[in-house]
């Protein structure tokens, strides 16, 4: 530990103590908040089922930065490099297309054995795993419908895929001793004016009920459902809208997933957290950065990321909110993208934990909005960076931009050699 860091740390402790904050307790609380990193940043959502296939479902990964992972070994190596540069507890979020098998496996036939290597790797790296059925980039999703498909056989294929995915998710939780959150997102929708908006939603409702009919121990598996405003090719109508899934999660008491990019650009999910928590048992958050649309840019330490973190901390939702990331930028170093986005989420959580929330709440309750605003703004100038640097030091990770040096070395020695 450098003397400079020690001095900054001691000064920070004093400054925060003056506003009633115990920084040691804040760091202990930060270690209760794992962030689930998404595997698909590492290979532009290609997966191992058909790596050369097209990405469909109304989503896009833009850019062609060299060095993307081409197989599971490379993807896990890239993840390990990123994990070394991110302090505190982490999880990994997998999609079904990241299965490993010597022979082709139909999506409705995936089994826990196809993810055994991921489980062993997670154990070695002390990670929990989360999961997602992959209801896109497949011939049977090419016409824009999956769980709401009008063809019963195709619809059943996707139902069976989701049911098989739940068994994989439960396997993760059982093996790793921490529940796997399995999120269902489907791209179903229409490009142009839709006459019958009800029938697809009726089919989706019935399909989801069949999907979740098998019961699993909640200590192993948690169901979540995710809405979206629109996607490319589904601009006019999305079957799984916010209202649909809010109603579904409330009536079935599943978790509800809120993705930062899946709403109108003037909406923010930070404002939805407290409302949804009154009705659903759990929330899954997909923290992302939409630029004009659901572009899935790398997460910044911006106002909305901070607001999301503050909502979690202010309302003590540690045990009811699951924090995941969802972005995929192929225009920059993919390992760096993971590190930047995940560190920013953790920084936002730390800043939220260093807020004198009780004092601010009292000011608000008494109607002293002047002092509330003044203290909120003064809080931004307190030396939270020194606390972050100590947190990094204690977790043996670089405190500042030094982590970029490690990424550059990895890029030169490993990534640059990939064709």
Curated annotation (Swiss-Prot):
Does the record bear Transferase in its keywords? Answer: no
Subcellular location per UniProt equals: Cytoplasm
Q: How is the cofactor bound?
A: Binds 1 Mn(2+) ion per subunit.
The enzyme's main class, written as a single word, is isomerase
Tell me the cofactors it needs: Mn(2+)
Question: Which residues are recorded as binding Mn(2+)?
Answer: 262, 294, 296
The record's section on Pfam families has: RhaA
- Major location category of this protein: cytoplasm
Gene3D superfamilies in UniProt? Divalent-metal-dependent TIM barrel enzymes
Instruction: Please name the GO terms that the record assigns under molecular function.
Output: L-rhamnose isomerase activity; manganese ion binding
Q: Name one GO biological process term.
A: rhamnose catabolic process
Pathway noted in the entry: Carbohydrate degradation; L-rhamnose degradation; glycerone phosphate from L-rhamnose: step 1/3
Catalytic activity reported: L-rhamnopyranose = L-rhamnulose
Q: What InterPro entries does UniProt report for this protein, alphabetically? A: L-rhamnose_isomerase, Rhamnose_isomerase, Xyl_isomerase-like_sf
Q: Which GO terms describe its cellular component?
A: cytoplasm
Asked if the record carries the keyword ATP-binding, the reply is no
Q: Which domain of life is it from?
A: Bacteria
- What UniProt keywords apply to this chain's record, in alphabetical order? Cytoplasm, Isomerase, Manganese, Metal-binding, Rhamnose metabolism
Q: What role is this protein assigned?
A: Catalyzes the interconversion of L-rhamnose and L-rhamnulose.
Similarity remark: Belongs to the rhamnose isomerase family.
Name of this chain's protein: L-rhamnose isomerase
| Lineage of producing organism | Bacteria, Pseudomonadati, Pseudomonadota, Gammaproteobacteria, Enterobacterales
Q: Which gene carries the instructions for this protein?
A: rhaA
